[in-house]
UniProtKB/Swiss-Prot annotation:
This is Metal cation symporter ZIP14. A motif (XEXPHE-motif) lies at residues 374-379. It holds the Pfam family Zip. GO terms for cellular component: apical plasma membrane; basolateral plasma membrane; early endosome membrane; late endosome membrane; lysosomal membrane; plasma membrane. Belongs to the ZIP transporter (TC 2.A.5) family. Its main location: membrane. Residues 29-155, 206-222, 417-422, 480-490 are extracellular. It catalyses: Zn(2+)(out) + 2 hydrogencarbonate(out) = Zn(2+)(in) + 2 hydrogencarbonate(in); Mn(2+)(out) + 2 hydrogencarbonate(out) = Mn(2+)(in) + 2 hydrogencarbonate(in); Fe(2+)(out) + 2 hydrogencarbonate(out) = Fe(2+)(in) + 2 hydrogencarbonate(in); Cd(2+)(out) + 2 hydrogencarbonate(out) = Cd(2+)(in) + 2 hydrogencarbonate(in). It is found in: Cell membrane; Apical cell membrane; Basolateral cell membrane; Early endosome membrane. Homotrimer.
Amino acid sequence: MKLLHPAFQSCLLLTLLGLWRTTPEAHASSPGAPAISAASFLQDLIHRYGEGDSLTLQQLKALLNHLDVGVGRGNVTQHVQGHRNLSTCFSSGDLFAAHNFSEQSRIGSSELQEFCPTILQQLDSRACTSENQENEENEQTEEGWPSAVEVWGYGLLCVTVISLCSLLGASVVPFMKKTFYKRLLLYFIALAIGTLYSNALFQLIPEAFGFNPLEDYYVSKSAVVFGGFYLFFFTEKILKILLKQKNEHHHGHSHYASETLPSKKDQEEGVMEKLQNGDLDHMIPQHCNSELDGKAPVVDEKVIVGSLSVQDLQASQSACYWLKGVRYSDIGTLAWMITLSDGLHNFIDGLAIGASFTVSVFQGISTSVAILCEEFPHELGDFVILLNAGMSIQQALFFNFLSACCCYLGLAFGILAGSHFSANWIFALAGGMFLYISLADMFPEMNEVCQEDERKGSILIPFVIQNLGLLTGFTIMVVLTMYSGQIQIG
């Protein structure tokens, strides 16, 4: 007798085995198979959450909390009227009252069976989904909130460090004509642009919309926004460099230099206009006029606001003028305008710092870093403008520091507003302000500082310094935003 093929034997054996396992007798004879009934599910719940054969009210509440049911804050007497508003998320007390449960009640199988449709309806309506998310966000926010001591302590410390920048102006006066000073100032201006712009993109504006960098994943999109800005900046600078070299090769001179240098006639007309308006008397003392021969362009209004040209004007004046006491009536109007505008600017800075610290210590320090990078070059420029407007060194230091102290007032308002109201509105205001300061105020100032080097033919070094400052500020803000959850302070 021939044996069957091994492969056919295996298939036949598997078929017989499958038929045997699917017969009802096999299931009935299986000793480990428990009998499943409707009551088994209720008994399992009572066994896991209760004691014996019943549940206490607290144990039933634990079951509801596990299912995210009964977490509302409503009143059943107000909502349950003729089957309306059943989509409301009820509290556990409301649900217990609807079934006449008291504190001493014991919930057995029959009571739990009657209570199950209530649980099923609340789960199906998803009424408590938004309530649970809000409760989780509130718990996370309350855990992350800094204490009052941390808010005021870190806030006062950061504002003090920022305000001390206003006293650094006098220390740099001897170095204003040095090449390294101008390039260092250029780096700080570019750094301020990078930090302010990136702080608005990565922290202030997203915080105003309620975004979380660890949950909403907006950092990459904000980086693309900065990339678009940087791409056009880089392309424009490269094109200017190439066109300048081409023009120098063909014509032997730069068209940019001819545009930035006014003619002698224009310079003289600018001086006469200032003399007629009476502004030049405040900007340049009579005994120093003889020292400014050939430097008439510095009195142009656009150049007076710029940091570099104002420093050239100040360096050309005699040091004895700075040390003289000046009557307040002899101080130019420009000095008071600068002091008032700088005070308002510092107040808004303090407002942003205070509101940031009420959210988290890390957010406050990030905002303070951006403001510090912006304040350093601005305070140096403001100090020189005050000197040129007729103030002595002592007066310039005093009023510059006085305007810087407005940051303390803004800090107090920011902390109080952020503690009692939503800080998102303050973040929105500060974000818009940071964008304006970085792009409309400091960016033209950075280009103006580069003009002298461009006229001399040294274009590459200022371009590299600008890129280093912008990318450094961008990197600082990206790192602070990405690792805000991992870095612990205090």
